[in-house]
């Protein structure tokens, strides 16, 4: 029962975290998505640039379709554009794909695929992806239940000031022995030394 109640509380971030929009002012600037603002009147220009492989345009179109801003809401189209941006290494697009696969937004729900996208984003330091990956290890969704990995990823999110990561780490600390926590910390050191690749 305690695990169930904790899981319900921790699920709030799982849903809300993927709803952040990131936009831009300059369609042709090579800036990061965090520096951009979308104007609905630029839809044709966004689509042209996105088709040409522009990461910012792909990312922003995905957000427009996911939120229904300036276009009819269409999760499948959002997944298409997020996937193209994620394939170019955009950590936020990877995180958003994790959310969409977790909840079946525009795709069949698939925790294994969600884990793939969260992991790619988490390896780049995305704290929400780190938290969600830890949460999936805690619950055994898409991966075998593994409190050591759950603790490691929760600690990574927590170390960046992400409160939900700290809460998950605290919950896990109550469920794990001191030797299991020590093992998780050693695992984290090993993974840190290889930039979390394969962790």
Language-model features and meaning:
Residues 60-67, 96-103, 107, 132-139, ...:
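Hydrophobic face of amphipathic alpha-helices that form TPR/SEL1-like repeat modules
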Residues 9-18:
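Bacterial N-terminal signal peptides
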Residues 30, 163-199:
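Terminal, low-structured helical/coil segments at or just beyond the last alpha-helical repeat
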Residues 64, 85, 100, 121, ...:
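TPR/TPR-like alpha-solenoid repeats
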Residues 46-47, 51-54, 67-69, 74, ...:
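Short helix-capping/linker turns of helical repeat alpha-solenoids
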């Amino acid at each position: 029962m305690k695990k169930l109640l904790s899981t319900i509380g921790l699920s709030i971030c799982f849903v809300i975290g993927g709803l952040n929009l990131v936009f831009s002012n300059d369609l042709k600037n090579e800036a990061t998505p965090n520096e951009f603002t979308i104007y609905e009147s630029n839809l044709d220009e966004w689509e042209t640039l996105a088709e040409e492989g522009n990461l910012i345009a792909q990312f922003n179109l995905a957000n427009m379709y996911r939120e229904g801003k300036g276009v009819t809401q269409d999760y499948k189209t959002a997944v298409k554009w997020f996937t193209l941006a994620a394939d170019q290494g955009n950590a936020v697009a990877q995180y958003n794909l994790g959310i969409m696969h977790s909840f079946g937004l525009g795709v069949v729900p698939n925790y294994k695929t969600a884990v793939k996208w969260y992991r790619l984003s988490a390896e780049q330091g995305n704290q929400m992806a780190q938290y969600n990956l830890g949460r999936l290890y805690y619950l055994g969704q898409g991966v075998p239940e593994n409190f050591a990995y759950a603790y490691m990823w929760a600690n990574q999110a927590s170390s960046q000031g992400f409160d939900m990561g700290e809460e998950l780490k605290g919950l896990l600390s109550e469920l794990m022995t001191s030797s299991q926590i020590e093992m998780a910390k050693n695992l984290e050191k090993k993974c840190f030394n290889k930039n979390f690749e394969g962790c």
